[in-house]
Each structure stands twice: as C-alpha cells, then as structure tokens.
C-alpha cells in the first residue's frame, strides 16, 4: 500500500528582484523511500491561474527584472521505492517586487554652439531596465559652467541659439520616469561657449544740411 509523503517543500528567500527563491525539501519524508527530486516552477500574476515557467530549472530561482510582478511556486516530484510518483507543491511566494534599476546611457548634443544655430538633444542611447514611461527634455545655460539656470522658453529636443545665449554654455536636462513611477534626472555634457555672429547694423544714415 502506498504511503503518502509527509511534510512539504517550502520556499526560502526574498521575493525581490536581484534576490532568489530556493526550494527547501528538508521536511519531506516517505516511508516508501524518497528517490531523486525533480523541480519545476510555475508563476501567476494573481496567485490563482498558474502557468509553467520553463525558463527556470532546478531548486534555485534567481530573480531578475522579468520575474517582477509575478508570484512563484515550485512543483516537486519524485518516485518512491515502490515506483509510485509523488507530487508536492510549495505555497506561493509573495509577488516579486521591483528594485529600481539606474538609468543608463547618455544624452548627446549635436550642432554647433553658434549664434543662429541649433542644438539637438539625442536620447536614443538612454535606457532603463525598468522601462521608460515618459521622457521630457529641458535646457539650461551657464556663464561659467557652474551655476546652471533653466531656459524656460523651450522644452523640446531642439534649441535655437539666439543672441541672449552668446557667451554661455548650454546643456540638456532630461527627466526619465520609469514604469514604476521613479524619476531620474540626467544631463548632457555642456557645450562650448556659444559664439557670437556679427549682426549687420539696421537702418540708414541720414545726412542733413544744417544752415544756409
């Protein structure tokens, strides 16, 4: 007569990105003997509808960004000494929580710092493993590259250089909000000082005759 196993496997570890879940089988006992264990993993976003997670193999589940938002459980099976296959399931883990990943990459400014010219802030190299929900660009200027002031007249990736920017350095300020609502602000490298372009005088010279 088959003897049912006593005890149950359980999950150890913290359900958090960059940590790991480990199957603890130390409490499992079977009077018919315990053969080699096999472990498969399942996951669910609701702890009700479980799906096989074939990406994970073995007793340790390292938690990465792709695991965030899911709960996991392990299905442990073995064949006892009389050839009966036994299946045990752990209680589900807590939902794996996110750990904020830093924004990577850089903002690159193209264009010449010259009056009448245009600078463009390129954000194609900006990356966040947590995903990017929104990205906004602002511009700042500084006389000596130390105290930076926001330029309120523009909030696009393009910035036209007017006479008022001559003698100042320019940089782009980029606000990145990830899909978990965390905001990170990064800056481009500052440009060289914006150079002046000579503006021709306007108007005419009038010669008036004075006296007789």
Which residue stretches match the model-derived regions?
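Ser/Thr/Pro/Gly-rich low-complexity disordered regions
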Residues: 1-212
